């Protein structure tokens, strides 16, 4: 394998790793948003219970 071929393969691998990292970040943001919604729902339930 030539140096140019290795460089091309490494470049492609880095591109895929970067894309995977972005997908992981998006997934983490979605999980955090879901957790925030769940906490908000729990706070709402507690507030309703206290108001009753």
Name each model-derived stretch.
Residues 8-52:
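Short, charge-rich amphipathic interface segments used for partner binding and complex assembly
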